[in-house]
């Protein structure tokens, strides 16, 4: 049995506690400084998590932020970061107050992200490592989880397959073995870049696949589109995988990772009706991004759109329309706030 501390009481952090519990680990969730009222409400409602619509088992210990120092000062084998990408600076600050290079436990990130730093692409795992090194912690072992695993499904223990990635294959294997259950099926990989890049950019491509219904034909009725758009969706998925392979290799990942759980698997789930696919469907119908955001998804975070805005300048410097026709069309539709138009002749 190992002691695991999950930082963040959101949907995925809380759901992730289930396979940890079922492996007989000492599992603890500690909220961020922004989640105190949420945790009070959660406990008042008998551990019914509103983001999961299911109860968190009582055996999973849930603490408010005030307990973070006490929890992390104990014998912790694995710290799981279930915070938003915007909370990475905060997390690095908290960890640097408690640990040094000699005693920091292994870290596992549930959060995905890609940004631009000094005109270079920077994955969220790399950003965390950079921030910790800036604070004097140089020996850091960070793993990440990739693959098609929605939080509500995991919380209800439905069969789910994921990949644990770490640059050191032995560490990836060990953590995968720690978490594997009869419903949470874990594999392992040393292609941390490939897994993380796939996980981030699939949000852009799931918008493109989500647009299939509107894009399938200009000459048929909405009723016909509704029944016959899957041909188009399949073509867009195939092109998405082709372009994801190019981009993953550009960021020093392995192209074969794209056809695994972190790429194709996650794209399939995300294209099935998540926030990115919803935004794509509105854009496919002919709305611009700003129109869709204002009228349909005003208060909803669309990760693919946020990423498109973040990397637009850099990706247009690095690639042309002939190389990444679908990705650039989607990104430029978002950032230039224009209707989505695809050049099918450029597809492979």
Predicted features along the sequence, with ranges:
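Short beta-strand/turn micro-motifs composed of small residues
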Residues: 8, 31, 109-111, 146, ...
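Glycine-rich, N-terminal phosphate-binding loop of Rossmann-like dinucleotide-binding domains
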Residues: 9, 82-84, 272
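General beta-strand structural signal in soluble alpha/beta enzymes
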Residues: 109, 140-146, 186-190, 259, ...
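Rossmann-like NAD(P)(H) cofactor-binding subdomain of soluble oxidoreductases
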Residues: 59-69, 73-157, 175
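NAD(P)-dependent Rossmann-like dehydrogenase/reductase catalytic/cofactor-binding core
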Residues: 202, 209-213, 217, 227, ...
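NAD(P)+-binding Rossmann beta1-loop-alpha1 motif at the extreme N-terminus of oxidoreductases
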Residues: 1-56, 60-66, 70, 117
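Internal alpha-helical scaffold of NAD(P)-dependent oxidoreductase catalytic cores
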Residues: 98, 131-141, 159-256
């Amino acid at each position: 049995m190992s002691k695991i501390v999950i930082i963040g009481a959101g949907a995925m952090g809380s759901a992730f506690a289930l396979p940890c519990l079922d492996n007989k680990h000492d599992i603890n969730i500690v909220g961020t400084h922004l989640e105190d009222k949420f945790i009070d409400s959660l406990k008042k409602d008998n551990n019914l998590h509103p983001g999961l619509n299911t109860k968190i088992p009582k055996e999973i210990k849930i603490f408010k932020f005030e307990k973070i120092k006490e929890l992390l000062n104990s014998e912790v084998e694995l710290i799981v970061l279930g915070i938003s990408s915007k909370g990475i600076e905060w997390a690095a600050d908290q960890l640097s107050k408690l640990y040094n290079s000699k005693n920091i436990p292994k870290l596992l990130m549930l959060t995905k992200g890609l940004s631009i730093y000094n005109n270079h692409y920077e994955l969220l795992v790399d950003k965390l490592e950079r921030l910790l090194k800036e604070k004097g912690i140089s020996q850091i072992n960070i793993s990440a989880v990739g693959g098609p695993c929605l939080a509500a499904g995991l919380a209800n223990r439905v069969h789910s397959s994921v990949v644990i990635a770490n640059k050191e294959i032995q560490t990836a294997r060990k953590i995968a073995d720690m978490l594997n259950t009869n419903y949470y099926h874990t594999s392992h990989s040393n292609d941390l870049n490939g897994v993380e890049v796939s996980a981030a950019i699939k949000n852009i491509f799931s918008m493109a696949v989500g647009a299939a219904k509107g894009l399938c034909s200009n000459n048929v009725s909405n009723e016909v589109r509704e029944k016959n758009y899957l041909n188009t969706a399949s073509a867009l998925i195939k092109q998405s995988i082709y372009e994801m392979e190019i981009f993953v290799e550009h960021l020093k990942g392995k192209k074969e990772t794209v056809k695994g759980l972190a790429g194709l698997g996650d794209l399939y789930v995300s294209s099935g009706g998540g926030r990115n696919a919803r935004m794509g469907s509105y854009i496919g119908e002919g709305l611009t991004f700003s129109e869709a955001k204002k009228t349909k998804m005003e208060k909803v975070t669309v990760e693919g759109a946020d990423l498109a805005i973040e990397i637009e300048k850099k990706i247009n410097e690095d690639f042309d329309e002939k190389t990444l026709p679908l990705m650039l069309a989607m990104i430029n539709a978002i950032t230039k706030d224009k209707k989505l138009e695809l050049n099918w002749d450029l597809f492979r």
